[in-house]
Amino acid sequence: MSNNYTADNIDALEGMEAIRMRPGMYLGSTDTRGLHHCVWEILDNSVDEAKAGHCTEINTILHKDGKVTISDNGRGIPIDEHKKYPGKSALEVVLTVPHAGGKFNGNSYKTSGGLHGVGSTVVNATSTYLHAEVIRDKKLHSLTFVNGGEVTGPLEVSNYKGPKKSGTSITWMSDQNIVTGKQIGRAHV
């Protein structure tokens, strides 16, 4: 260790890199409690839709392989291009840019839970896999991420003929090298 302490010694982490380097800061813990916190962050988004009167159904699936899926019949995360991030859908921005969300100005939600624009990004940053599906305007919009938020391709759009008019589904697998909790307790969800 050197006595020479200069600007060269100061790191400035940004975006998802900071989350992956210090996940406990965002999850409170990296053990089973952190794993549960990831579930609550995604679940809070669906609950916010319900509290705002836009959602009547929320489903949580704990898969045997450790993945988690939370889906709702809310409005669906916006999928149009974000004005501040040309070429990126609002869905990609919400899942990859800390402090991006619809809960800051009070126009979309009167009350909300979670980390207010950080939660979905934190879940993605601490996952080996995350797949998002949004149903809007009779279209299914899909986006997949790997290795802590690397998008695997462009937003995929296909016709949707299912029963839902709109909604969001998020499926992810937490990175066991970051969030070391082994099993999600059903009682905690």
Task: Name the predicted role of every residue range.
Residues 1-8, 66-90, 101-186:
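GHKL-type ATPase core
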Residues 1-43, 92-95:
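Bergerat-fold GHKL ATPase/HATPase_c domain
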Residues 33-57, 119-126:
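Conserved ATP-binding N-box helix of the HATPase_c
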Residues 57-64:
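Short beta-strand/loop element within the Bergerat-fold HATPase_c
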Residues 27, 31-35, 50, 107-110, ...:
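Short, surface-exposed helix-loop/turn micro-motifs enriched in polar/charged residues
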Residues 51, 61, 161-163:
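Sterically constrained small-residue positions within well-ordered secondary structures
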Residues 18-21, 25, 48, 52, ...:
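Conserved helix-loop functional segments at active or binding sites
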